[in-house]
Amino acid sequence: MQYPEPISKLIDSFMKLPGIGPKTAVRLAFFVLGMKEDVVLDFAKALVNAKRNLTYCSVCGHITDQDPCYICEDTRRDKSVICVVQDPKDVIAMEKMKEYNGQYHVLHGAISPMDGIGPEDIKIPELLKRLQDDQVTEVILATNPNIEGEATAMYISRLLKPSGIKLSRIAHGLPVGGDLEYADEVTLSKALEGRREL
């Protein structure tokens, strides 16, 4: 169906979001058109504000509005343990369970040769640099339990094995092929408890 240009652009914009197909994009566009103008302006300002004012922590790579992030700045956290995750949303998922008290390292992706993503395309060099600090004694690999996540975990474990740093992988209480961000706190807690040494 042919829509006026402003609606078409709005629909196209919504379709750029993950999981939003044409039908959902049309529903969202018409929902926004039915909203009060001040609510739409607040929504637009929130989007722009988030884009302009959020950055990645220079230490761990987590999304933040201050650098270093609040997790890296927290002196109560155990600096001897680093949990390696794929995305900032995985840090949020881990933090929800309130059981992990170490540091994080966000890779911003996973090794995926089919997509042309190699080890140098994600934050593995930054991880290796962080591990030169004698304080780190354990690395928990909490990449997603799918092919890319497993390949990334195996690659990192092979790199770190000679260092003598204790390596563990979160247990597969998480569904294979699933994403960490969608797991509930109990599942994440059990997966963390059941991690295994590599």
Swiss-Prot record:
User: What are the start-end ranges of the zinc fingers (C4-type)?
Assistant: 57-72
Q: Name one GO molecular function term.
A: DNA binding
The UniProt similarity line reads: Belongs to the RecR family.
Concerning SMART domains, the annotation shows: TOPRIM (SM00493)
Cited Pfam families: RecR_C (PF21175), RecR_HhH (PF21176), RecR_ZnF (PF02132), Toprim_4 (PF13662)
The UniProt record lists the keyword Calcium? no
Cited SUPFAM superfamilies: Recombination protein RecR (SSF111304)
For this UniProt record, the keywords arranged alphabetically read as follows: DNA damage, DNA recombination, DNA repair, Metal-binding, Zinc, Zinc-finger
Name listed for the protein in its UniProt record: Recombination protein RecR
Q: Which PANTHER family match?
A: RECOMBINATION PROTEIN RECR
